[in-house]
């Protein structure tokens, strides 16, 4: 028989750097999860992606067991890394802070494809380009 789901917790945690300190500890503690067990497993699973922000969906069951799914880093994080900037523009319509190439956008779209609601890579590229424009980046051919 399937376990009954008690709670679903969504967090964004730096890869390989989950600690029991806030915000991870309190969120997991409220859900009744073994915090050290989660942090060790998460850090082991994401050790190869150090420095990236990883979204994670934790499913907590009534018997206090859990499992989790890691997703691909947010498009904004991947775009900032590709452009080599710290953060996007506060005024994206008037102040452009960086530029990314179509090749970089395609690479990001292929990375994010499993998490995007897109039929093909072209549609995913359009989504990533929209994110880039809203961050004050220009997309060059």
Swiss-Prot record:
Keywords: Methylation, Ribonucleoprotein, Ribosomal protein, RNA-binding, rRNA-binding. PROSITE patterns: RIBOSOMAL_L11 (PS00359). The keyword Electron transport does not apply. InterPro entries: Ribosomal_uL11, Ribosomal_uL11_bac-typ, Ribosomal_uL11_C, Ribosomal_uL11_C_sf, Ribosomal_uL11_CS, Ribosomal_uL11_N, Ribosomal_uL11_N_sf. GO terms for biological process: translation. SUPFAM superfamilies: Ribosomal L11/L12e N-terminal domain, Ribosomal protein L11, C-terminal domain. SMART domains: RL11. The keyword rRNA-binding applies. Part of the ribosomal stalk of the 50S ribosomal subunit. Interacts with L10 and the large rRNA to form the base of the stalk. L10 forms an elongated spine to which L12 dimers bind in a sequential fashion forming a multimeric L10(L12)X complex. Belongs to the universal ribosomal protein uL11 family. Forms part of the ribosomal stalk which helps the ribosome interact with GTP-bound translation factors. This is Large ribosomal subunit protein uL11. It comes from Limosilactobacillus reuteri (strain DSM 20016) (Lactobacillus reuteri). The gene is rplK.
